[in-house]
Design a protein with these regions (language model features):
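Acidic/histidine-enriched alpha-helical segments
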Residues: 49-54, 100, 107-132, 216-227
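Extracytoplasmic/secreted envelope proteins and their assembly/folding machinery
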Residues: 32, 49, 53-56, 98, ...
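Catalytic Zn2+-binding segment of zinc metalloproteases
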Residues: 38-46
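An aromatic/glycine/proline-enriched structural segment found at the starts
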Residues: 1, 150-161, 165-166, 181-256
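N- or domain-start disorder-to-order transition segments that initiate the globular core
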Residues: 1-16
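A conserved active-site cap/scaffold subdomain adjacent to cofactor or substrate pockets
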Residues: 244, 254-257, 261-274
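M16 family metallopeptidases and their MPP-like homologs
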Residues: 13-32, 37, 49-103, 132, ...
Length: 281
């Protein structure tokens, strides 16, 4: 498909959500894990946490984030930004927030022409601590072992999570080269909320896409999520130092290969459990 901005108008929303997603065609997972944190930490213009916080207030930016999304066999570097709608704020701040997003995405904070080595090291240590803390909790450990049981191709459990030593390969220079390669391609853009569709599309094209419309190629294959069906029941028991016990059950879904099935599975999951982190297979 081409990267023409997609505007989804909904008058009931009091907030507007902007998504900017860059397809990633060639990557090392350990680099992406750190890249998403380094990019939105600060920028060339907002080179301190204080300046960034003030910019958010001035632009009425309610929240922003960057993350890596994996959909089928595709990876995306995704940026999301939320701001009040015209109806709730009595003021249109779309242009201000688009300019803010452009600054954060295309003008990252650099030192000596590459990402800050200090920020990269901090992000690596934060990721390591997050992994260690998850495995210290009985529920996190149980989910990890559960995913390992059914995950043959690293779709549920990342290679980095299983082997933190991979992060030693990440350097500020390599990370910056990866970043430049990713953002050199056309992004997919979505704007959802109570907006003026025509005006919004023109602003997104001008500020984010630089009026360049081109094709974006990616594949959809949901079969990668599903392990081959087994006719036998496999039971795994493990003793640990946790004082609390935890039980995980996996149910395989046959022939889940389209988006519709994934939506229905999410609904069934929420009906059967109050915990939105539970996944049925």
């Amino acid at each position: 498909r081409n990267n023409e901005p997609i505007i989804i108008k909904n008058d009931e929303f009091r907030k507007c959500i902007l998504f900017i997603s860059f397809p990633i065609y060639d990557y090392k997972e350990e680099e992406l894990k750190i890249l998403k944190d380094v990019i939105f930490d600060r920028s060339e213009k907002y080179d301190t946490k204080r300046k960034l916080a003030i910019a958010c207030i001035n632009n009425y930016c309610l929240s922003y984030r960057s993350k890596i999304s994996f959909i089928g066999n595709n990876a995306f570097l995704e940026f999301a930004l939320i701001y009040p709608s015209v109806a709730s704020l009595k003021k249109d701040v779309l242009q201000d927030n688009l300019l803010f997003a452009r600054e954060m995405i295309f003008n990252p904070y650099l030192e000596n022409g590459v990402f800050s080595e200090k920020l990269v090291r901090e992000s690596i240590e934060m990721y390591k601590e997050g992994v260690k803390n998850k495995l210290k909790r009985y529920d996190g450990y149980c989910q990890y072992k559960n995913d390992l049981l059914i995950d043959e191709n690293d779709y549920l459990v990342s290679k980095v999570f299983k082997d933190l030593s991979l992060l030693s390969n990440v350097t500020s220079e390599r990370l910056y080269n990866v970043y430049k390669k990713i953002i050199s391609g056309p992004p997919l853009t979505f704007l959802i909320g109570n907006v003026d569709e025509k005006k919004s599309k023109e602003l997104v094209k001008e500020i984010i896409l630089d009026n360049k419309i081109s094709n974006v190629k990616f594949e959809t294959d949901y079969n990668v999520y599903v392990k081959n069906i087994s006719n036998s029941v496999e039971v795994v028991r493990e003793n640990s130092e946790f004082s609390t016990s935890s039980v995980c059950c996996n149910y395989k879904v046959r022939d889940m290969c389209c988006y519709r099935d994934r939506v229905l599975l999410t609904i069934v999951k929420n009906l059967l459990s109050s915990n939105n982190s539970d996944v049925l297979f």
